[in-house]
Each structure stands twice: as structure tokens, then as C-alpha cells.
UniProtKB/Swiss-Prot annotation:
Main location: cytoplasm
Gene designation: CSDE1
Location of the SUZ-C domain: 64-105
PANTHER family, alphabetized: COLD SHOCK DOMAIN-CONTAINING PROTEIN E1 (PTHR12913:SF1), UNR PROTEIN N-RAS UPSTREAM GENE PROTEIN (PTHR12913)
Protein name as it appears in the record: Cold shock domain-containing protein E1
CSD domain sequence ranges: 1-51
Length: 114
């Protein structure tokens, strides 16, 4: 699914499902399209159907990763046993928000509250 910037009237985003795109074309951000608008009787919302790409938008160019990140990624070793490890521990809390649970455990009958 996706959304079309629909600039007629109150200028909003119009939902469309990928099945509504004609000829199986994969749309990209910036593509110009033609479509029909339908009203869903159940939800009362409009959506686009019979979506055709009129012309392709500008190709998106991915920004290169910053040098500091590239250098950091090169230095990571996943199987280094001597690397520092982080382990987060927290004490359990009782139902009354007290720290931990009592060491004494009572045997209770099912369905009996004391």
C-alpha cells in the first residue's frame, strides 16, 4: 500500500493498495500518477484505484555513510571473546512494588485466599 499526495480541495494523502497499480509497476516517491477516486461505503473514506504512472520522478540517491561510521563498522568483530560485554540486570519487584520476593514460600490451596 501507499499514499498519494492528492492536491485537490483540502489537499490530503490518498490511500492506494499495490493491487490497484496498473501493469505491476513499482511506484517510487516523486512519480506522477493518474487515478480514479472511490468512496468506501463501509468506512466512508476515499481511496485511489486504477493507478497509472504518468512519468517517473527523480531518482533518489542514497547519501553515503559518514566516515566515522564506516571506520567504526570496519573495526567491529563479532566473535571477539575478549570484547567487553554488556549485561543488564534488574531485581524483580513484588506486586506491592517491593524489591524482590520473600525467601519464604507458602504452600496454598487452589482457590483459597488468606
Amino acid at each position: 500500500f501507499g499514499f498519494i499526495n492528492y492536491e485537490v480541495g483540502d489537499s490530503k494523502k490518498l490511500f492506494f493498495h499495490v493491487k490497484e497499480v496498473q501493469d505491476g509497476i513499482e511506484l517510487q516517491a516523486g512519480d506522477e500518477v493518474e487515478f480514479s477516486v472511490i468512496l468506501n461505503q463501509r468506512t466512508g473514506k476515499c481511496s485511489a484505484c486504477n493507478v497509472w504512472r504518468v512519468c517517473e520522478g527523480p531518482k533518489a540517491v542514497a547519501a553515503p555513510r559518514p566516515d566515522r561510521l564506516v571506520n567504526r563498522l570496519k573495526n567491529i568483530t563479532l566473535d571477539d571473546a575478549s570484547a567487553p560485554r554488556l549485561m543488564v540486570l534488574r531485581q524483580p519487584r513484588g506486586p506491592d512494588n517491593s524489591m524482590g520476593f520473600g525467601a519464604e514460600r507458602k504452600i496454598r490451596q487452589a482457590g483459597v485466599i488468606d
